[in-house]
Amino acid sequence: MKQQTKRLLKSLCMAVGVVLLSAVDPLAGYATERTIDIKHLGEGQSIVRVDAQAKYLLLPVEESSPESKLYMIVDNDVVRTFNVRLAVNKVDYFVPVDLSGYADKHISFNFQLAPESALCWKEMKLSDQFDSSNREKFRPAYHFSPAWGWMNDPNGMVYKDGEYHLFYQYNPYGSMWGNMHWGHAISKDLIHWEHQPVAIAPDALGTIFSGSCVVDKDNTAGFGAGAIVAFYTSASDRQVQSMAYSLDNGRTFKKYDRNPILTSTQRDFRDPKVFWHKESNKWIMVLAVGQEMQLYSSPNLKDWTYESSFGEGQGAHAGVWECPDLIELPVKGTELKKWVLICNINPGGPFGGSATQYFVGTFDGKQFVNESPALTKWMDYGKDHYATVTWSNAPEDRKIALAWMSNWEYANNVPTLQYRSANSVPRDLALYTKNGQTYLSSTPSPEMLKLRGKAQKKGTFKVDRSHEVNPILSDHTGTYEIEIKFKNNGADIMSFQLFNSKGEEVEMHYNLLDNTFTMDRRNSGATDFSKTFATATSAPISAAKEYTLRLLVDNCSICLLYTSDAADDLIGVD
C-alpha cells in the first residue's frame, strides 16, 4: 500500500536552511541603548560591565566556535559560571542571560577564551525582552520541546495537585549539550505544556545531572508535609547525589544545606530514582553505577543505606548504564504483579548508540531479581528512544513513561538551531505474557486522543500487488495520525510506504517468514548530518491473522505502534 502526503519530514533534517533564511530577527524592535562597557585584557580575556536595569544580556552564538567560559559577577561575587560558544564570524542565534533580581547591583562578566576580534563584542545587546517564539518550521507540535536551548533526559517527573511536572536536562546558553540545569514545564493533561523558569541551577558541587522527584506526603524528611523533594546528581570531576525541596508545588526549589547526601569513588555514579516502598516502609533509591544498578534505602530521604547491586551477567553491557527506574505493574489477564527495572544504556543499543532495556522480576525492598537472566528485552525498537523514566505519584497508580526522542550518536548534530531535541509522547506502561515470558507494552497515553480532529476514513479495499491512497489527507500541517487495520491472505511480505512528491519516503514492511517488522528511514529526506542516522530498524513481532498499525506523525518524527490479535508489541521510530 502506498500513501502520499504533501508535507512530511521523516527526520529532523529537511527544512532548516529554509527556516534560517526566512527567520525573523529575534532582536527586531529591542531597546539597545543601555550601556555595555567592554575591556579587553589580552590572551582571550575580557571584562564586560552591563546596565543592571535591563532584564537580559543577549549573547550571540556561533555553534562552530569553541566554548568560552563566562563568570557572572554581582557586587564582586561570582553568582554564575557557564560556557557559551560565542559568535566569532557569524551569529547563528542569541541566548539570554537573565539579569532580573539584580536591580541596582553592579553586574559584570569575566569572559575567558574569547578572541578580541570576535563578532560577539559588536552583537551582544541588553534588552527587556527575549523572543522565544518558534522560528523552526519543523518543530514538533505535540511532542514537548524546549522554547530554546538544548534538552536531553526527562528528569524529576512528578504529579501533584492536578499538575504534571516535567523537569529535564537543559542548557539555556546554547543548543548543544553543556551547562546542565533542570529545565521545567507544567501540564494539566500531559499534552499542553507551560514553560517555567529554570528549576535547579549549577552550584559549587557541579552541574545538575539527571534524577527524580517524590511527594513527601508524611514529612519524613522534615521539610514539610507534601513537599516535592528532588534528587539529582551534582557533576564535576566526580559525581555525587544531592537533594532540593519545594514548598510551593515545584515553582521554586531550595537546595538541602548538607548536600551531598551520597558519595562514591566510582566515576559513573548518577541518576537517582527514588520511590516509596510500602512493604518495607522505606524510601528506595536506584542509582546507575558504571554497568550496574545499586539500591539504597532510607527512612527520611537524607540518610541512605546500601542494600544490593544488580547487573552482572544481565542484559546488554556494551555501554554505561544510566537513568534507572523501578516500578511495579499488574500482569494483564492475571492477578499477579511484577517489578520492572528500566535501564538505559549508551552505547549498546540494538541499532547503535543509546537505547532502553528493561528487566522483569521481583523486588523485596532490598534486592531486585530478574526472572529471565538469559534474555535482553528492549522497550522500543526505534533508534530515537532513550532515558525513559516514569512519573512519580501519578493518579490511579498509572505508570506513565516519557523518553528523550534522540540518540547520542547524532543528537548534537541534528540540524535545528533555536532548540535541539524533543521528548516522546507520554506512554502508559503495562505487562503482558507471550510464549511464557513477561513483556512490557507501552501505549500512547489516552490523553493523546484529545488531539484528534475529524477522521477521514478511506474505506476497505483489497491489495493486489499494490494500492495507492492519494492523498492520504486532504489538509494537514505535518501533524496527523494514521490507523491501518488489515488481514493477511497468505503474503510472505507486506509493505507500506509513506512518501511525498519530492521522492522522500519511509518504508515499512512485515516479513512473515522471520516474524519481523522493519521501518526504513534511509530515503526519508536530508540525512547527511550523521552517518548513523539513515538506518533501518527491525523488531520481532507475533504471527497473527489481524494487525493494526498506528502511526503518529509530528513534523520531525514518526512513531509506529503495532498490535495484533496475538499480542501487544511496540515498534517506535520517534
Q: How would you describe each model-predicted region?
A:
Residues I482-I484, K545-N555, C559-L561:
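Short tryptophan-centered beta-strand motifs in secreted/extracellular beta-sheet-rich domains
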Residues R465-R521:
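Secretory/extracellular carbohydrate-interaction modules
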Residues Y562-D569:
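Conserved small/polar residues in nucleotide/adenosyl-binding loops
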Residues C13-A23:
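Bacterial N-terminal signal peptides
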Residues T32-P272, W276-E322, P330-Y381, E396, ...:
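Beta-rich carbohydrate-recognition and catalytic domains
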Residues A23-E33:
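Bacterial Sec-dependent signal peptides at the C-terminal "C-region" and cleavage site
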Residues Y256-N259, K502-E546:
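Glycine-aromatic-enriched beta-strand/loop faces of beta-sandwich-type recognition domains
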Residues K2-C13:
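Bacterial N-terminal signal peptides that target proteins for export
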